[in-house]
């Protein structure tokens, strides 16, 4: 943001400092200075001169000899400029003076050019009359060639640099995008007044307009209020185009803006002064005297002011009349409504458009302007009408036209006032300061923050969209208290050792167990194709099909958020199989996204899943063993139960199980269904397990109880049992735990047999049971009694001891 010091002083007249002091102090208060440019650099001994007499050069047809009154003397100057006449007032650099640069737009030397008296074709010359470029300014503002001629009230001997407004400096600041208010001269002046503790005088805007009603000239309808929260319009008739006054041209030129005429310059001036872009339309070109703010239609062609035809889509907001599009909202107007020299009546527009939409639209159509750059940052809707009224005031003051009374203001949802609790103690604790409430309120008063004593709340003005919480207010205190005044203090509080969150510790254990068992970690996309549901054989009404659609997908294959984690795993296993990798074991931690309702009204439930997949030298029990290792490492050994399930259509119906703890399902495990294998172009057998981490984590524990070495001997009993094949060992182990009591130390499966010696449909299962007492040596009869209880319960399942 470029800020000419003279323009700042127009609002802060008591500002008394050098440009460098201004830049340094503003930097300390939060406005980071990038550079300081002195407009009068290398301009020395330059005064106003009046040409009293002109004579032809005796030996050169293209040179003339001028007698120039420079106040206290008359000097002779030889020049070849064709545009000077007797009586003209011109800038003159005297003998020994210095000018900024050369002619024809050449690059200015670092130290300028020193002027000395000399002879031109035999005639002495005691100085030089200057063009505007030789004074370091731009030809955009002044005539393209020749000596600059003053058209204002100056007299010989006056400081020509001062008369041209070049005794000035422009400070460039790096403004962060959250400080939208500082992308304006008023905003920077407010900051300067607060920083230097000076009074701030913003422009006094008076009521403008004749007795007519603007509604008789124009109607406005906004169809997309979300993209255009406010639209204001006023009408000016009897337009009189002319050059804008020099003070306005100088200020615009200092900002790098080329002056054009009073009408265009006023819109640019107000944009820099208020930070509010404006646009002017020729009202006579607007059909039906109606403005409609709506989205474009995809494929529409529109020619902008720069003569380029651009293709629109439905996301681009357009300004239209009763028949056609006349402007791209917030970016550039149309060639069909441009202001020409023949304009009689104009429509002024000052609006607030959605910053995100403007940024995206600008990118889509490949057009970025000064206006779009400001809108992108998110403007204050309350500023639109203030800027509009200021522009109309300048129209009247400069005699550029007659303002029609009243204004159109479409503002359906005014900005709500933001109030924040004043918490001085918390601010001091955060900053390490000891600032009183009175000091805080004094700082806030400087930047127009109000205070409601009844509620102890700070009232945030609409232009400070960056203030949302206590920490933001604390930053304002720090800025004006002075960062360099905040004492250096050591951190207080009790030092504690770092510790991972419990959830991360559980995930680390699962990850370590998987890797110890030969698994490699991977990561797949959270985006999937709806076709995945068919590949996994999910029913049409399966809850997994209720997936969130992505508004800007990379393609159909990445168009929804996944609701099941298996697709990524199976795709990875299929890729490995295609590359002939043997004995592959993979795991992944990743979220699935379960919407609470569709379309989305709130954030979805993001559930972390640990997915394991393997093929090669393995079977169902290999993967089951890995899951059991994880549960053992999480203090859940012996608490899990495995129940056969047919709930998951993508798993083999006879080789799948749900894993539960305390009756709550934490995982499922099984072999992939053969049809699903075909869908993923895989052969052989693939086994997967999916663990729901939000269910598992609360059940895990890292508390461990250690017992000393046993003092008394153990007693073992081996049981070889015959049972139907559909009885699971988990059912047997539950009976062991229930009936074995405290004396049952452990049990271990050591044999499973099916064959000729066992009746068809039956199997033999053998367990070794270990019994031990902590306080005595067990007797055989005592153990036999417990075993009898176990056998009695097993008989109820149809389990018999093998003969």
Feature annotation, model-predicted:
Residues 1-212, 347, 366, 370, ...:
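Phosphate-backbone binding interfaces of nucleic-acid-interacting proteins
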Residues 24, 64, 200-301:
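Glycine/proline-enriched, intrinsically flexible loops and inter-domain linkers
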Residues 41-44, 208-210, 495-500, 524-543, ...:
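Beta-rich nucleic-acid/ligand-interaction surfaces
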Residues 48-78, 261, 267-336:
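Conserved mixed alpha/beta core segments that line enzyme active sites in large multi-domain catalysts
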Residues 121-134, 144-146, 161-162, 169, ...:
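Mobile "lid/hinge" segments at catalytic clefts and subdomain interfaces of large enzymes
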Residues 196-222, 399-427, 434:
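Terminal amphipathic helices with adjacent charged low-complexity linkers/tails
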Residues 420-582, 717, 770-773, 778, ...:
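Extended, well-folded interaction surfaces typified by the phenylalanyl-tRNA synthetase beta subunit core
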Residues 446-449, 596-600, 605-606, 611, ...:
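A carboxyl-terminal module marker
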């Amino acid at each position: 943001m470029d800020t000419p010091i003279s323009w700042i002083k127009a609002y802060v007249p008591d500002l008394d400092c050098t440009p460098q002091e201004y830049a340094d102090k503003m930097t300390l208060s939060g406005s980071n200075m990038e550079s300081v440019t002195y407009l009068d650099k290398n301009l020395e001994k330059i005064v106003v001169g009046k040409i009293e007499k002109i004579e032809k050069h005796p030996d050169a047809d293209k040179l003339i000899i001028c007698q120039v009154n420079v106040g206290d003397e008359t000097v002779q100057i030889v020049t070849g400029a064709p545009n000077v006449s007797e009586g003209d007032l011109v800038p003159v650099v005297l003998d020994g003076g210095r000018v900024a640069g050369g002619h024809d737009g050449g690059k200015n030397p670092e130290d300028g050019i020193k002027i000395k008296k000399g002879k031109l074709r035999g005639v002495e010359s005691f100085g030089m009359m200057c063009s505007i470029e030789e004074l370091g300014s731009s030809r955009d503002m002044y005539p393209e060639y020749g000596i600059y001629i003053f058209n204002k009230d100056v007299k010989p001997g006056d400081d020509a640099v001062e008369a041209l407004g070049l005794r000035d400096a422009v400070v460039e600041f790096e403004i962060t995008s959250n400080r939208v208010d500082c992308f304006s001269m008023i905003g920077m002046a407010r900051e300067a007044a607060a920083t230097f503790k000076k009074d701030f005088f913003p422009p006094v805007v008076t009521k403008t307009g004749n007795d007519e009603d603007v509604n008789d000239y124009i109607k406005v309808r906004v169809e997309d209020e979300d993209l255009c929260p406010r639209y204001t319009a006023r009408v000016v008739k009897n337009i009189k185009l002319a050059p804008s006054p020099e003070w306005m041209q100088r200020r615009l030129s200092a900002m790098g803006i080329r002056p054009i005429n009073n009408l265009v310059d006023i819109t640019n001036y107000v944009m820099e002064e208020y930070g509010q872009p404006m646009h002017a339309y020729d009202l006579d070109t607007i059909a039906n005297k109606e403005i409609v703010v709506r989205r474009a239609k995809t494929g529409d062609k529109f020619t902008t002011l720069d003569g380029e035809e651009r293709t629109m889509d439905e996301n681009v907001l357009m300004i239209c009349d009763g028949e056609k599009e006349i402007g791209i909202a917030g970016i550039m107007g149309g060639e069909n409504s441009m202001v020409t020299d023949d304009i009689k009546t104009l429509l002024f527009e000052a609006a607030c458009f959605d910053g995100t939409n403007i940024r995206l639209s600008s990118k889509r159509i490949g057009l970025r302007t000064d206006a779009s750059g400001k809108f992108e940052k998110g403007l204050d809707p309350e500023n639109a009408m203030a800027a509009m009224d200021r522009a109309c005031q300048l129209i009247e003051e400069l005699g550029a036209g007659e303002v029609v009374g009243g204004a159109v203001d479409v503002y359906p949802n005014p900005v709500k006032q933001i109030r924040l609790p004043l918490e001085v103690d918390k601010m001091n604790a955060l900053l390490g300061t000891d600032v009183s409430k009175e000091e805080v309120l004094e700082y806030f008063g400087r930047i127009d923050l109000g205070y409601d004593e009844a509620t102890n709340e700070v009232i945030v003005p609409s232009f400070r969209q960056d203030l949302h919480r206590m920490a933001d207010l604390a930053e304002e205190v720090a800025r004006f208290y002075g960062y360099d005044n905040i004492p250096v203090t050591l951190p207080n509080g009790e030092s504690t050792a770092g510790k991972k969150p419990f959830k991360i510790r559980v995930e680390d254990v699962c990850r370590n167990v998987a890797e110890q068992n030969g698994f490699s970690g991977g990561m797949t996309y959270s985006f999937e194709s709806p076709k995945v549901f068919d590949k996994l054989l999910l029913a049409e009404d399966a809850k997994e099909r209720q997936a969130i659609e992505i508004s800007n997908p990379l393609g159909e294959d990445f168009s929804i958020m996944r609701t099941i984690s298996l697709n990524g795993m199976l795709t990875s296993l299929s890729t490995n199989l295609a590359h002939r990798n043997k004995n592959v074991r993979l795991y992944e931690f990743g979220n699935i996204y379960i919407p609470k309702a569709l379309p989305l009204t709130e954030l979805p439930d993001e559930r972390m899943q640990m997915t394991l997949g393997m093929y090669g030298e393995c079977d169902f029990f290999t993967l089951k063993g890995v899951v059991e290792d994880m549960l053992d490492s999480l203090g859940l050994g012996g608490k899990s139960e495995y129940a056969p399930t047919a709930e998951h259509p993508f798993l083999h119906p006879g080789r799948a199980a749900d894993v539960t703890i305390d009756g709550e399902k934490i995982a499922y495990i099984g072999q992939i269904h053969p049809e699903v294998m075909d869908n993923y172009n895989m052969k052989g057998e693939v086994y997967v397990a999916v663990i729901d981490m939000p269910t598992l984590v609360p059940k895990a524990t890292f508390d461990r109880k250690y017992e000393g070495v046993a003092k008394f001997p153990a007693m073992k009993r081996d049981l070889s049992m015959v049972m139907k094949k559909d009885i699971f060992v988990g059912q047997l182990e539950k009976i062991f735990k229930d009936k074995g009591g405290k004396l049952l130390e452990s049990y271990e499966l050591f044999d499973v047999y099916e064959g000729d010696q066992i009746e068809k449909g039956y199997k033999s299962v053998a367990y070794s049971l270990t019994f031990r007492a902590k306080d005595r040596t067990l007797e055989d009869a005592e153990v036999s009694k417990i075993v009898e209880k176990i056998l009695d319960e097993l008989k109820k399942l149809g389990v018999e001891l093998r003969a």
